[in-house]
């Protein structure tokens, strides 16, 4: 069980404009602080987890607090072909299999530099590299920069790749539609600051209850500022 109580403070300089706004709206420096508290209880055995919620609900902050050792930061791509940016201790056959496993199957694109790839291709390359380098991966903004068709294909490919290699993958996303495609073993919803389920067959029940809640105007927010 992972308990957290995170207070996020901002270093605000009290300039003339800042002081004027604070005075006009009766706002204090402390009001800019954010607090996130809750508990993530992971199953004994799992391969895929999902931290999901609206923007500003603390997804990345919480993930870095709990899964910082496996957080995937911006990779450095310096070669003219992305295949040469993969780990040096990995064979070409392993790289090719990994590219295919994450849905990066365009061989001509393997020969291109990272900066000319599409957003969807970049995401797949990042995933492939992370999987080649780590056994446990926490991936921020998962599917955030791709259309939903690409997101669906990527989720299905990632599910198969992670389970086949028996690795652990934590996706961080604001998109609830990936629950059905990614099929995570557990979900932490930052809108409610609680575990939603840890059993795969409860996913449909959760999605249905969420739609009903939104249609009824349920307030899902739970952030202290």
Predicted regions span which residues?
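Pre-NBD coupling/linker segments of ABC/ABC-like ATPases
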Residues: 1-42
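ABC ATPase nucleotide-binding domain signature region
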Residues: 6-8, 41-104, 180-181
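GG-anchored amphipathic helix commonly corresponding to the ABC/SMC/Rad50 NBD signature/C-loop
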Residues: 65-66, 120-139
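H-loop/switch region of ABC-family ATPase nucleotide-binding domains
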Residues: 173-176
């Amino acid at each position: 069980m992972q308990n957290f109580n995170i207070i996020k403070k901002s270093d605000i300089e009290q300039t003339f404009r800042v002081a004027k706004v604070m005075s006009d709206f009766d706002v204090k420096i402390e009001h800019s602080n954010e607090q996130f508290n809750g508990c993530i209880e992971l199953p004994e055995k799992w391969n895929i987890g999902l931290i999901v919620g609206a923007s500003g609900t603390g997804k990345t902050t919480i993930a870095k607090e709990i899964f910082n050792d496996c957080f995937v930061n911006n990779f450095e791509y310096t070669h003219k072909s992305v295949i040469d940016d993969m780990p040096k201790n990995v064979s070409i056959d392993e790289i090719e299999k990994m590219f295919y496993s994450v849905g990066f199957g365009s061989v001509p694109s393997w020969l291109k530099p990272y900066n000319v790839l599409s957003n969807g291709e970049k995401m797949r390359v990042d995933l492939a590299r992370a999987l080649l380098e780590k056994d446990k991966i926490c991936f921020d903004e998962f599917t955030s920069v791709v259309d939903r068709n690409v997101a669906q294909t990527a989720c299905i490919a990632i599910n198969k790749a992670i389970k086949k290699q028996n690795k652990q993958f934590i996706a961080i996303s604001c998109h609830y539609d990936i629950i059905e495609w990614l099929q995570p073993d557990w979900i932490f919803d930052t809108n409610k600051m609680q575990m939603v389920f840890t059993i795969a067959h409860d996913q449909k029940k959760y999605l249905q209850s969420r739609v009903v809640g939104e249609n009824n105007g349920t307030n899902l927010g739970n952030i202290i500022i």
